[in-house]
Design a protein with these regions (language model features):
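Non-transmembrane, solvent-exposed regions of membrane trafficking/translocation machinery
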Residues: 1-231, 235-239
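Extended, hydrophilic extramembrane loops/domains of integral membrane proteins
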Residues: 230-231, 238, 245-281
Length: 282
């Protein structure tokens, strides 16, 4: 239970709770705006050619080329080689250039999605690859270069999601409608945490308008993924198996019980018109 009181200080309120929830977790819930957005996605098959072209262009840019690697032994520059006249000799090999893959060096596992014949294993999958958090700034820089960004549709936005792997992001290609999502969470009327086969999920329910919009959105995206973004953070991108009617949907994503519980609180409360900031806790 929450108790909200007006503060004597302008622009401030006091929020009290009888929960034993840790303060950092409570502050995250309290300061969440609760903005929910649903996006269609691009499949890897739709943008694979653009990614290969981006990697090629980056590899030809002088600032991203790898240095040449010599085939001579290390420290050979001060050695003298004497060959008898008429003896078989091997001409010094020319320097070779190391294979240059600037984009795929940081966008990992993309190329592993192709079989030995160069065909995509799952062309409808929307996950583009993984990126180490330490390399994320480099990947963002590459994708924002004019020569690279123009290769992709104007409606495409690359989104980042914490993966189950340590210090790694999953990279997903979102499809926007002139920068906007396909649907928002304004028609969500309730949200609750449920357990399904031992997994923690969040079940949401829409009003009649939202139910109709959700049915239409899922009907047009069968065998594709829909991404859910909360407060600007990608949280899941489930694959749509069939049209979903009835105004209900389950959100799954390997959530812990705390994550699923917090998400249900945020979604069930609706979006706030402004973002709160904690100035003091007691």
């Amino acid at each position: 239970q929450l108790t909200v009181e007006k503060s004597a200080q302008w622009g401030c309120i006091h929020v009290k709770t009888d929960s034993v929830m840790p303060v950092p977790r409570f502050e995250i819930i309290l300061t969440s705006v609760g903005s929910v957005e649903f996006y269609e996605t691009y499949s890897i098959g739709q943008i694979a050619t653009s990614l290969f072209e981006a990697n090629r262009i980056l590899g030809e840019m002088p600032e991203y080329k790898k240095p040449k690697t010599s085939t001579l032994p290390q420290n050979s520059s001060n050695q003298n080689y004497i060959v008898e006249e008429g003896a078989n000799s091997t001409e010094p090999e020319e320097d070779v250039v190391e294979i240059n893959n600037p984009l795929f060096d940081v966008l990992m596992s993309f190329t592993s999605q192709f079989d030995e014949n160069g065909n995509l294993i799952n062309p409808t999958y929307c996950q583009i690859g993984y990126c180490a958090k330490a390399d994320s700034a480099t990947l963002v820089h590459y994708l924002q270069l004019d020569a690279i960004s123009r290769l992709f549709p104007g409606s495409l936005v690359f989104a980042w999601m914490n993966s189950g792997r340590d210090n790694m992001y999953e990279i997903i290609a979102l499809k926007t409608d002139r920068g906007l999502p396909a649907m928002t969470g304004e028609n969500i009327v309730s949200a609750k945490m449920v357990q399904n086969s031992g997994n923690h999920e969040v079940q949401i329910e829409f009003n009649s308008e939202g139910a109709n919009n959700w049915a239409s959105l899922t009907r047009h995206n069968i065998d594709k993924s829909l991404a859910m973004v909360i407060d600007g953070n990608l949280v899941t991108y489930p694959r749509v198996m069939s049209e979903i009617t009835g105004g209900k949907a389950s959100i799954s994503g390997n959530f812990s019980i705390e994550e699923a519980s917090d998400m249900s609180l945020i979604l069930g409360s609706g979006a706030l018109p402004l973002k709160l900031r904690v100035v003091k806790n007691e």
